[in-house]
Amino acid sequence: MMPNTDVSSLSMLGQQTETAKSPEEAVLEKVPSNHAGTDYVVRFTAPEFTSLCPMTGQPDFAHIVIDYIPSEWLVESKSLKLFLHSFRNHGAFHEDCSIYIAKRIVELLDPKWLRIGAYWYPRGGIPIDVFWQTGKPPEGVWLPEQGVATYRGRG
């Protein structure tokens, strides 16, 4: 029998929800993991992430991959989607967006392990890729490659 997940504390799932005006205002929610004690990888992929250049206000685009090994909690996916969307009108450098996303999730979940790969499309002709992780993943966990090809342009 599948365990039931208590969703009574969630405020966004199943509700019409406004997008926060900034990442700082955005609410991330969590649900209990029914598999605490089992090491497995959860992956979220945001292939159309957008934010704004803090200098020019022009849009920046990235393909973001977040992998984590839960401890007691899982990030609720609608809240993550809205959190990521809150960057759409937010001006910040690529590195700041990428690391802020990862640290907010770590703060919320206290996962056993987390990594982020943020593959930014070129700005000024140079693609910027940002990688960060909390440490080494636990032994024996299947950790697939993130699968995002290096930017090649028309080459």
Swiss-Prot record:
Keyword Transmembrane helix: no
MF GO annotations: preQ1 synthase activity
Annotated Polar residues bias: 1-20
Catalytic residue positions: C53, D60
An example Gene Ontology CC term for this record: cytoplasm
Classification via InterPro entries: GTP-CH-I_C/QueF, NADPH_dep_7-cyano-7-deazaG_red, QueF, QueF_type1
GO biological process, any: tRNA modification
Pathway: tRNA modification; tRNA-queuosine biosynthesis
EC number: 1.7.1.13
Keyword Oxidoreductase found: yes
Protein name, as recorded: NADPH-dependent 7-cyano-7-deazaguanine reductase
Organism: Rhizobium etli (strain CIAT 652)
Family: Belongs to the GTP cyclohydrolase I family. QueF type 1 subfamily.
Catalysed conversion reaction: 7-aminomethyl-7-carbaguanine + 2 NADP(+) = 7-cyano-7-deazaguanine + 2 NADPH + 3 H(+)
Compartments in which it is found: Cytoplasm
Broad class of the protein's primary localization: cytoplasm
Function: Catalyzes the NADPH-dependent reduction of 7-cyano-7-deazaguanine (preQ0) to 7-aminomethyl-7-deazaguanine (preQ1).
Record key words, sorted: Cytoplasm, NADP, Oxidoreductase, Queuosine biosynthesis
The gene coding this protein: queF
Annotated S-S bridges: none
Gene3D superfamilies reported for this sequence: 3.30.1130.10
Source organism phylogeny: Bacteria, Pseudomonadati, Pseudomonadota, Alphaproteobacteria, Hyphomicrobiales
Binding annotation for substrate: V75, E76, S77, H94, E95
Region spans: Disordered: 1-26
